[in-house]
Amino acid sequence: MTEYRNFLLLFITSLSVIYPCTGISWLGLTINGSSVGWNQTHHCKLLDGLVPDQQQLCKRNLELMHSIVRAARLTKSACTSSFSDMRWNWSSIESAPHFTPDLAKGTREAAFVVSLAAAVVSHAIARACASGDLPSCSCAAMPSEQAAPDFRWGGCGDNLRYYGLQMGSAFSDAPMRNRRSGPQDFRLMQLHNNAVGRQVLMDSLEMKCKCHGVSGSCSVKTCWKGLQDISTISADLKSKYLSATKVIPRQIGTRRQLVPREMEVRPVGENELVYLVSSPDYCTQNAKQGSLGTTDRQCNKTASGSESCGLMCCGRGYNAYTEVLVERCQCKYHWCCYVSCKTCKRTVERYVSK
């Protein structure tokens, strides 16, 4: 772990970043954001990560900041879960608000993190509205479609369309509206991927219901529109990451647009992630490319997917070691009311890449 942190520090201090990744610098709020009261305007300048336009939004909407700090934490957690079985070492996200080249350039990985962050911000705000945590919003409006005979609209839906998207997009897109945030191509890429993330979030709205009736008969249901969990949204975006389109800038009329590099006759789809710079294979350690390599990464000997030793180890082979796990076992419930368990030891074999 110490070697990894030293290597990451070398990345941050020794490289000149080609593309500034200000669009997701706010993920650095996970470091000390929870310790700030967010009840005075000067708090908006206390921590690194917020660009001037986001600081202004913070000053006008201090009550949002607890949700945004939570969104930063959820984004990192979702990224960790989504890429734990991939060669790309998601740990570079921990260096926010400063990033290494794997996220500081317009890579496929940056496209995923940017879109996920945009989705999670709006998700966190919409949920906070429904939970009563924000004085400026409340539950979502009742759906306009007619309720079926077996249910009625009610409950408290996540306020996505009328508040979560509005405030989330204002926050996420603010850095990329400023020309000083980087080259236009990079800003166009981030704005596009932000929109993709929010579209996936909108598509995740689903009907959720609560049953009423004698002895749980569910003769009547009260239903509302709620968002799916972040893990589901992250999984959808990972699928888009795997099929992301490499793009190049092109002047079309008076507008500069991004078009697919390989199929320039086809416009970029509104629902596909795009990237500007091809990623390395992340097999070996390379500071200039932002690759930590896969040496000592755990792999699965029997799997066939990205977590398999064949793919994770890049053909270098793997080392095996045994680990003794101490677990609770043979648990019994006693009336009333406690559970007693024995302690068991189990030896498992682990594999790490050479």
From Swiss-Prot:
Record lipid sites (O-palmitoleoyl serine): 215
GO BP term, pick one: secondary palate development
Protein name: Protein Wnt-11
Organism: Danio rerio
Record's function text: Ligand for fzd5, a member of the G-protein coupled frizzled receptor family. Plays a role in early eye development, possibly through wnt non-canonical signaling. Promotes eye formation, at least partially, by antagonizing the Wnt/beta-catenin pathway. In addition, promotes coherence of eye field cells, potentially contributing to the coordinated morphogenetic behaviors of cells in the nascent eye field.
Disulfide bonds: 129-137, 139-156, 209-223, 211-218, 283-314, 299-309, 329-344, 331-341, 336-337
Similarity comment text for this entry: Belongs to the Wnt family.
Signal peptide: 1-23
